[in-house]
Curated annotation (Swiss-Prot):
Region (Domain I): 1-64
Region of interest (Domain II), residue spans: 65-143
Biological processes, Gene Ontology terms: DNA recombination; DNA repair
Designated name of the protein: Holliday junction branch migration complex subunit RuvA
Region span, Domain III: 153-197
Membrane-spanning residues: none
Record-linked InterPro entries: DNA_helicase_Holl-junc_RuvA_I (IPR013849), Hlx-hairpin-Hlx_DNA-bd_motif (IPR003583), NA-bd_OB-fold (IPR012340), RuvA (IPR000085), RuvA_2-like (IPR010994), RuvA_C (IPR011114), RuvA_C_sf (IPR036267)
Compartments reported by the entry: Cytoplasm
Self-association and partners: Homotetramer. Forms an RuvA(8)-RuvB(12)-Holliday junction (HJ) complex. HJ DNA is sandwiched between 2 RuvA tetramers; dsDNA enters through RuvA and exits via RuvB. An RuvB hexamer assembles on each DNA strand where it exits the tetramer. Each RuvB hexamer is contacted by two RuvA subunits (via domain III) on 2 adjacent RuvB subunits; this complex drives branch migration. In the full resolvosome a probable DNA-RuvA(4)-RuvB(12)-RuvC(2) complex forms which resolves the HJ.
Function description: The RuvA-RuvB-RuvC complex processes Holliday junction (HJ) DNA during genetic recombination and DNA repair, while the RuvA-RuvB complex plays an important role in the rescue of blocked DNA replication forks via replication fork reversal (RFR). RuvA specifically binds to HJ cruciform DNA, conferring on it an open structure. The RuvB hexamer acts as an ATP-dependent pump, pulling dsDNA into and through the RuvAB complex. HJ branch migration allows RuvC to scan DNA until it finds its consensus sequence, where it cleaves and resolves the cruciform DNA.
Family: Belongs to the RuvA family.
GO-annotated molecular function: ATP binding; four-way junction DNA binding; four-way junction helicase activity
Originating species: Stenotrophomonas maltophilia (strain K279a)
Gene: ruvA
Keyword tRNA-binding: no
Amino acid sequence: MIGRLRGIVAYKAPPWLVVDVNGVGYELEAPMSTFYDLPELGREVTLYTHYSQKEDSVSLYGFLREGERRLFRDVQKVSGIGAKIALAVLSGVTVEEFARMVQAGDITALTRIPGIGKKTAERMVLELRDRAAQFGAGGALPTGSGPAPADPLSDATVALQQLGYKPAEAARMARDAFNEGDEVATVIRKALQSALR
């Protein structure tokens, strides 16, 4: 199993990134919480990883903080929840915000996260409430900001679609959040914050 990677950021376009470790490029899927704090291309990064192997695919997920990886794993223990929804949780709210929602039984706030309906939110509260206090952000690693992609509006729209939003809704959210000069991570962060209000 691969538990951690340290290498050079070779590529990043939400939700995908490639980390070059001694000449081997590891492709990882990561939540927006990780993308917000990734160093720029060509800089070193250390990521906590989660390796997943299924019949037809092998996936590697990356997180800047141990607490995010722990939450990613715990959320998937809830029946009916997979990696896509776990990534949406970490892309929409912080570990601490999610813990507060679960502890308070705030079904309404949980259903604002893409892919989570009322029944799923209720299951999350029921199955995670006892562990919610243990969700911790963990230590943050050195961060930086990357260069703006060629088309942050388009990239943000694609990233929002991959988080579970319908194409028209993702395009509207990205347009509403976009300001000239914004990086893709900024557009996505503002769009998700707006959607969760």
